[in-house]
Amino acid sequence: MPCSEVHFLKAEIYARGLAGITANLATAKTEYEAGITGSLNFWTQAAINSPVWVVDKPAGLPSGVAINAVLNNPIVMLDPTDATHATQQIYAQEWIDMIRQPWDAWTLLKRTGGLTPMDPDNAAGYVSTYGNFNRYQYPGSEKTFNLVNWSASTGGTNLVSDKIWIAK
């Protein structure tokens, strides 16, 4: 788990007041900004290390000025007055950070009840397209080679709309 994800999870805990922690948006903001900074550094380092990236390849990690420009962008700045909006902002940045971890991003979508970014002009289309996904389908080989357990687990269907056992 990258440091950015740890910071985003801590930001959520402080924003929502989870696990016996008193809600504190100031501390949530500190963790949120540390998560964004960690994400920017991680993905920039990935670009630097990439043998494929040759055009406009970053020469180094983002400067403090560049990071502050991102953190001070009105769209990115954590809302210090509204815990619900702040939590959605945390989820959005965590989702962006998970760009190369689609399974984790999908889990975040499910864990947050669909509060990850979506096109606001097509929210209904997003929900009708992706909102019924509860799990990945088992590969056909699972049914072929493990029919008894597959049947017990799925009830004989292999639909993405079927809930996983922990969500039933």
Identify the meaning behind each predicted range:
Residues 1-168:
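Acidic/polar-rich alpha-helix caps and helix-coil junctions
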